[in-house]
Amino acid sequence: SKKNLTLTMLYLVPTPIGNLEDMTFRAVNILKEVDIILAEDTRTSAPLLKHFGIDKKVFAHHQHNEHKAVSEIIKFLKEGQKIALISDAGTPAISDPGFLLVRAALKEGLEVQCLPGATAFVPALVNSGLPNDRFCFEGFLPVKKGRQTRLKALAEEKRTMIFYESPHRILKTIEEFITVFGTERQASISRELSKLYEENVRGTLTDLKLHFENNPIKGEFVFCVGGLE
């Protein structure tokens, strides 16, 4: 029936987390087809779009304007515009803007499609060597309010846990994890995934603390912690 031929209007398009070769053919084609591209930071996305010869109207869509922008974007979608959302790196709406827009579009009965593609936590989990049959993704922990509550709630977690962390907080986070999970808990930290200086450090939380106290702390970090055995 014709009902099933609804053209998908909102696409969530993953972008490389460091290596441009990780862009999929389909991602490039969708970005060339849509009418509007929403980017987390237009300056970050410009080189990527230029590299793949994508010349489209690009608007900023980030955590500071997404609440306001959603209704306007929904209006464009209802007019039949095709829109793609990209984040600075990886899959939109995973620890990045996008969730509010997806929810609003679905509420309005619009079609939403997320393309498979780059995301930082999957390679970090797989190459950590920690059990990955069951895991929980925690993203960024709250910076202040609710941080200790969240950590206490995870103290009994049996699944492998995955966190995102920024370089300036990584040592403090390792110390907090030692307090909650103990010195001997197995863990793995991946940084600069898919880039030239990719590094995966595995061992106990104590091993990781020693390593990062004595080595430069740069790049994007994914922190995997083994569950309670």
Role assignments for model-derived ranges:
Residues 62, 70-119:
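Glycine/small-residue-rich loop that forms an oxyanion/phosphate-binding "nest" at active or ligand-binding sites
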Residues 17-20, 88-92, 167-169, 228-229:
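Short glycine-rich anion-binding loops that position phosphate/pyrophosphate groups of nucleotides
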Residues 5-63:
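Glycine-rich, flexible N-terminal cofactor/catalytic loop recognition
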Residues 9-10, 80-84, 160:
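Loop/turn-to-beta-strand initiation segments
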Residues 100-157:
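Class I SAM-dependent methyltransferase SAM-binding "motif I" and its flanking Rossmann-like core
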